[in-house]
């Protein structure tokens, strides 16, 4: 599954009768552009999508590397994108990014926000119209 891309790590996100994979390239500590694929099942067929990140520094995953997709308990198709910001010269000063995953035409995307709360998921649009 997507092995030819030499991904750093892969995070599965099941949503609305589909599954998405969030990943990035193997660049060590350096952030890079996020990649995303989706399929009707884990077995494919897989479709590659453009970089799912939007906003400032989206071309380098907001300065981080994806680490996990956290489902929001009690909310359908609600997920938090989690990423680490590593600082090689100061490893004890690692930072973290948590952003809500949003959907457009049934495809997940991650938009930079300076701040947000879990109330965001009470106002969001559904992952697809066939729920």
What are these language model-derived features?
Residues 1-131:
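Carbohydrate-active catalytic/glycan-binding domains of CAZyme proteins
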